Amino acid sequence: MKNVTDSFVSLGDWPYAGSFAFNTDILATNPINLSVVLGVLIFFGKGVLSDLLDNRKQKILSSIRNSEELRAKAIEQLEKARARLRKVEIEADKFRVNGYSEIEREKGNLINSTYENLQRLENYKNEAIQFEQQRTINQVRQRVFQQALQEALETLNSCLNSELHLRTISANIVMLGVMKEITD
């Protein structure tokens, strides 16, 4: 133990300035102290540093895995969105085609119904014209008949005198009698 205490005591003994001597005191020499400190740091710090690096590595790997999972989910959602978009585009095309065909069908129906309405109106017009023609013809016939009857009455009245009138009545009575005998 005396050697240990002597070494501490010798710390107080410094060589004089300008002299050169070899210091055999291990604790007093700086390179040895540094190597010891570095050795202790390496020996004990190696585990701590290794743990820190392992933790950091695990965090980085975990972050990469999470990023990969998020990327995979994003790709999956993108594919689903693209599939929905294609489906919506197909449905839109169907609606567009059906809409155009519906418009064409309605257009055809409208043209057909308009044509039928025009045909009915044409028939009504023709019937009205025929009715008016028939009515006019009947009115003309009736008027001609009335005028002919009026002229015949005027002619008879002007030609008939009482003697001719009596003879016509007698002849008609005889004809009625003969007709009665024939029918009996």
Swiss-Prot record:
The principal localisation class reads plastid
Q: Where is the signal peptide?
A: none
Residue ranges crossing the lipid bilayer per the database entry? 27-49
Pfam families under this entry? Answer: ATP-synt_B (PF00430)
User: What's its membrane topology?
Assistant: Single-pass membrane protein
Locations listed in the record: Plastid, Chloroplast thylakoid membrane
Q: Which UniProt keywords apply?
A: ATP synthesis, CF(0), Chloroplast, Hydrogen ion transport, Ion transport, Membrane, Plastid, Thylakoid, Transmembrane, Transmembrane helix, Transport
Give yes or no: UniProt keyword Glycosyltransferase. Answer: no
Q: Give this protein's Gene Ontology molecular function annotations.
A: proton-transporting ATP synthase activity, rotational mechanism
Q: What's an example GO cellular component term for this entry?
A: chloroplast thylakoid membrane
Question: What other note does the entry give for this protein?
Answer: In plastids the F-type ATPase is also known as CF(1)CF(0).
Q: How does it assemble?
A: F-type ATPases have 2 components, F(1) - the catalytic core - and F(0) - the membrane proton channel. F(1) has five subunits: alpha(3), beta(3), gamma(1), delta(1), epsilon(1). F(0) has four main subunits: a(1), b(1), b'(1) and c(10-14). The alpha and beta chains form an alternating ring which encloses part of the gamma chain. F(1) is attached to F(0) by a central stalk formed by the gamma and epsilon chains, while a peripheral stalk is formed by the delta, b and b' chains.
Q: Relate the protein's function as given in its record.
A: F(1)F(0) ATP synthase produces ATP from ADP in the presence of a proton or sodium gradient. F-type ATPases consist of two structural domains, F(1) containing the extramembraneous catalytic core and F(0) containing the membrane proton channel, linked together by a central stalk and a peripheral stalk. During catalysis, ATP synthesis in the catalytic domain of F(1) is coupled via a rotary mechanism of the central stalk subunits to proton translocation.
The similarity annotation says: Belongs to the ATPase B chain family.
Stated name of the protein: ATP synthase subunit b, chloroplastic
Q: Which organism is it from?
A: Ceratophyllum demersum
Question: What's the source species' lineage?
Answer: Eukaryota, Viridiplantae, Streptophyta, Embryophyta, Tracheophyta
